[in-house]
Amino acid sequence: HFGSFVYKKNNKNKKMIRIFITCFIALSLGVNAHADIKGSTLNKISEKVSSTVSNLIPGEGLTEVDISIRDDNEGNPEVQFDILGVRDLIDNENSNVFTQFSLHSQDVNGDKRAIGNIGLGYRELNADQSMMIGGNIFYDVDLFEQHQRLSMGLEARAAIIDFNYNYYQEISNNQIVDGFNEKVLSGQEYNLSSQLPYMPWTTFNIQGYRFENEKAAQDTKGNIYSLEMALTPSLAFDVENDVSSVDGQDDMWNYRLTFTHPPRTNKATLMDGLTSDVAFVKANMQDKLKDKVRRNNNLVVEIQGAVTITKK
């Protein structure tokens, strides 16, 4: 038992070391890209793409297009595309009622799916505008196979740190797809995020998640560590590592480019400089009223057969 404990501990330490090395490499790439960004080459390209993005969804508000690559460390990368919009319904200086919606691709058991999400949210600032609290509800659906899910979320966000919690509840029956029984799982997650010290153009996020399996021996659980980097007002690059707590489950890596419209002129980017004189730059809380909700738009699906696996 002691030997097993030591092995698991060493394995966990190796995972953490790899996470820090990857974040260091990502930041180093940011340093190397800084000269190019200052020369405005990347900025001009991202602004051009951003203006094109603005035409995809009508109305005023945040519009994002993501291109991401998921790597399972076994040479099976998955490319996913996502378009997301946030639109105000009733807003003023201290509160906001809004809708958020997205359409994206997801690979489930080698099969490309189209996943739709639509939600309604409410956010409010406290009296001195130092904190924002909010709640939201979402409906998620696999447009091809009719898997369905509801979620409820809570947010508490301050000038230098954000927290949110999401609970997901499946509402559809099992579906037979290509001879396999598929089941959407219920579960929950939390997110805690803040900027790296003296780098206001970065955000480091820790997510803990757990989804209740139906037939698999263990629930799907783990932690996701992500580094989000705002390169220009219109372009961000994210690196995340999904560290599973399930025995025998490999880590997943995700690399994402996000084009945003309108450009985030009120948020620090790498264009403003690699470092700041202030350790933590306080964010404008009114701007956070119009941010997207941080949640998992992918469905977590258990594929039941001779061997039961889970895709998320």
What does each model-found stretch correspond to?
Residues 1-15:
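N-terminal secretory signal peptides that target proteins for export/translocation
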Residues 21-28:
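Bacterial N-terminal signal peptides
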Residues 35-58, 171-205, 211-217, 230-238, ...:
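Flexible, glycine-rich linker and terminal segments associated
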Residues 37-125, 130-142:
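Outer membrane beta-barrel translocator domains of Type V secretion systems
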Residues 60-63, 91-99, 125-135, 160-165, ...:
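Repeated loop/turn-to-beta-strand initiation elements of outer-membrane beta-barrel proteins
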Residues 61, 75-83, 95, 112-118, ...:
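Residues that define the transmembrane beta-barrel architecture of outer-membrane proteins
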Residues 69-73, 103-109, 122-124, 139-143, ...:
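Transmembrane beta-strands of outer-membrane beta-barrel pores
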Residues 83-87, 118-122, 137, 152-158, ...:
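Residues on the lipid-exposed face of transmembrane beta-strands in outer-membrane beta-barrel proteins
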